[in-house]
Regions:
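Eukaryotic scaffold repeat domains enriched in small/polar residues
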Residues: 1-179
């Protein structure tokens, strides 16, 4: 159910699922030497058929576990994992992603530092001045995808069959003179 978001620099990176770093048949040519020289991080991986697989993330600036729902590839199975989800990056480089298991959206900055999170469990009757149930302020049952602009965040809530429009505010603002 949970996956990770990985941030690679413009020079690229790789996620290796094969301990021998075999290049898949779909890739043409060998990985460049500068990529292979980058540091790696070993992580647990779920490849659809095994929860005990190992993976190596090479050349990443950071990775964040907690992106959900994450679509699994069920190799050799007739199980349908039909949901895919989406995260977004705003004009300032902040990453907005759904955390379906916690009924919220989480936000990290360009260095993977948590900035904020918003949303709580709620159904179609929840939230808003005209709602039958006034709380929570930002109700979510199945936050599936997120889109962010410089002023608003849009969240597709599959179970509640709606798109939430959340206005971004700042707790404090300060101006200074530029010399």
């Amino acid at each position: 159910m949970y996956g990770s978001i990985v941030k690679f620099p413009p020079s690229g990176g790789a996620i290796w699922y094969d301990k021998n770093r075999k290049v898949p048949d779909t890739v043409t040519g060998a990985p460049p030497a500068e990529l292979l020289a980058k540091p790696t991080v070993k992580v647990q991986a779920h490849l659809g058929y095994s929860t005990e697989a190992q993976a190596e993330i090479q050349g990443a600036e950071w990775y964040r576990f907690g992106f959900s729902p994450h679509t699994l590839i069920m190799t050799g199975s007739d199980t349908c994992m039909c949901y895919g989800s989406g995260f977004d990056v705003d004009p300032y480089g902040r990453v907005f992603f759904p955390n379906m298991g916690q009924f919220r959206v989480e936000v990290v900055d360009t260095a993977n530092n948590p900035i904020t999170m918003f949303g709580k469990y709620g159904n179609q009757d929840s939230g808003g001045k005209d709602a039958a149930v006034k709380k929570p302020d930002i109700p979510m049952a199945w936050p599936l995808s997120v889109a962010a602009s410089d002023t608003h965040v849009y969240v597709a809530d599959d179970i509640n069959r709606r798109v939430l429009k959340v206005r971004m505010n700042h707790a404090a603002e300060e101006s200074c003179e530029v010399k």
